[in-house]
Amino acid sequence: YECYHCPGIHPELCRIMPLYREGLQSYTDSRTGAPHGDASDSRARVGPGFATWTLDGQSKLPLIDGPSEADRALGVVFASFTASFFIVMHPDYVRTVRLSPRGPEQVELTVDWLLPPGVAERHAGELEKMVELGRMVVAQDGRVCELNQQGLRSRRHRQGVLMPQEEPLHEFHEWLHRRLVAA
């Protein structure tokens, strides 16, 4: 998967996730299938000295029961279910992100941070730290989306092709096209 906008848009996130500095989200280059970097696991991981997605990469929240030590060491594990919904597991919390179209140029974004029962009450002072980086990344993405939308309205805009790293988006386009043709 790609994150080719990450280096220029998300400096705070790239500090925590070194692979994102290269515009990638996986150590496997989707164009060639060749390993990228020196990871034995194809998934991206937090950098040395970081444990989770907070501005300083640290957390005082308890670890979530269930994930393996290998998954916890990554600092983040993504699961995408559709082009508009994904779950992100961190060692100390889970985040869901849902995009719901509201019109041709509007989308509703819902981000939920999930904790095991009782953790929010026992660690109230840590909650802002938990959501701070996520809110920042969402705001940065929102601004870029707004600028992109302005460009799409330009008389000079010409439709292009998707990059090889955008394979999941291509699959979504094909799925949508099949649904529209069948309707």
What are these regions (language model features)?
Residues 1-183:
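C-terminal catalytic domain of Rieske-type non-heme iron oxygenases
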